[in-house]
Amino acid sequence: MPEQTLRDHLVAFGLSEKEADAYLVVLRSGQSTTSEVAQAADISQGYVYELASELVERGLITLDESTTPTRLRARSPEEALGTFSERLDQLSDELDQLYRRAEPGDPAIELVHSRSTVRKRIARTVDRAQDEVVATLPASEFTHLRTALAEARDRGVTIYLQLVSPLEKLPADIDWDSHGTVVKTWDATPPVTVVADERAGVMGAHSILSGRHDSAYALVFSQPDIAGAFFGNTVSNFWPMGELRHVATPDPLPATYDHIRTAVTNAALHRAAGRSLRADVTIRQVGSEETSTYEDVAVVDVRQHLVGEPTNEFPIENSLVFDTPDGPIAAGGNDGSLQPFYEGYAAVSVTLVDGIVES
């Protein structure tokens, strides 16, 4: 088996990438000093002691501190695998008990420590997105995620992408339009946050994907209330701090949307280009399932701050205001966890139409 494949398997079993590197150094030689491990795995000698403690706890090595220098000795594969097998059997029993107690449809929440697993969960989140992705990620992760982002854009997913420190890791000559609707950069280290369709995603410390992540964990979730909270935190506190790198051309008109935040973003881009807008809109009052439809009404205001100059009154406000025969009506989104609580109306469907070009 190639060593890289073995390393991947070890990471899949819960070892960090550095733990796997250190263990393979010891495994190859049978025993190694801390300095030998540090040199071969390209890590500091002080960090080797920390990794060694983890590997001892996992039952993979023994630590002989009676010698000078301290020696790390690999346990036989039979002993090491026996430890893994015992833990897997115990885990299987515990999972089975939890599964039998759980009610159908319980939200999935997962704590992940492995960097490679976090990357896989983020890619899965983007792969499953139907309408929208909001992501704050270290710039070094763009290479790992660029295929998933490009495929999501091809599916028509709106992507708000903020890439943060280390910005020097960004590849040159990126076709931003193929990977994001609105792209920003920010030389800071906010938490990693990826939310899809305001229903599922991943959130963790910046260090889980950049530099040494030590004891950092990421939360993987598929509960709308949790997704909405992380979405609101990201767009309120971190998104405004970024420097704009790219904005996609708005959708050609007429365009119909059932995901209203996408309609709001496109409306903002059209108005920034000097176009007035009219719309056919179906709305429902909050707390009611009955809908009303207005045809060929003017869009008199766009309230948002995801693209261009902010026009909202509070961070998560995202709505269109229509001049209807019943007076001005502000309508927010109809899906996700952030249901309209300010506007009073939710837009079920909106068709934007080009109005008279403003002078």
Model-derived regions: residue spans:
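Primarily the HKD phosphodiesterase
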Residues: 129-176, 287-301
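HKD (HxKxxxxD) catalytic microenvironment of the phospholipase D
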Residues: 181-234
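Anionic-ligand-binding alpha/beta catalytic cores of soluble enzymes and soluble regulatory domains
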Residues: 212-269
